[in-house]
């Protein structure tokens, strides 16, 4: 018979932390103990930051990014190129592209990729809003920045079919050898994609 070693409040904290990606029950217990030990330095500021996030952060009605203003700072930045829309699966992908300064265009967050096995269909994504944006005369290119997975490629093909009537160029990210990568460590699919998408040097 298991013996309760913590009160219900602490158990609730552990249960909630265990719902975070990458945290199982054991890691959640360690995180909870760390927060409790660092109450003034970490737990109180974290609770405050979470409350601010609850009160102020919202989803951009234009692109699906999260921000403290709506439309978001990316959509309202006059230095951005309004003719380019970069399509990503989720906000984490948008942030990755921004960290890399990979584009000066604007974004569209689908919310996920099509995944029949997980029960994610077209109605679960913001594809209709993307198609509507693609028909804006100011938009000239849609860049599909989706993962090179089966679900990512399925989504890319589905979106491309829906954009055939829009007067836009549809491109996707190149797939292949990563910077600093060694050929011997790459899988066959990556090597094949890199060979097909080779460029002049």
UniProtKB/Swiss-Prot annotation:
One of its GO terms (molecular function) is DNA binding. SMART domains: TOPRIM (SM00493). PROSITE patterns: RECR (PS01300), TOPRIM (PS50880). Residues 83-178 form the Toprim domain. Coiled coil: none annotated. Disulfide bonds: none annotated. InterPro entries: DNA_Rcmb_RecR, Rcmb_RecR, Rcmb_RecR_Znf, TOPRIM_dom, TOPRIM_RecR. A zinc finger (C4-type) spans 60-75. One of its GO terms (biological process) is DNA repair. Pfam families: RecR_C (PF21175), RecR_HhH (PF21176), Toprim_4 (PF13662). Keywords: DNA damage, DNA recombination, DNA repair, Metal-binding, Zinc, Zinc-finger. CDD domains: TOPRIM_recR. SUPFAM superfamilies: Recombination protein RecR. Gene3D superfamilies: 3.40.1360.10, 6.10.250.240, RecR Domain 1. Belongs to the RecR family. HAMAP family: RecR. May play a role in DNA repair. It seems to be involved in an RecBC-independent recombinational process of DNA repair. It may act with RecF and RecO. This is Recombination protein RecR. It comes from Rhodopseudomonas palustris (strain HaA2). The gene is recR.
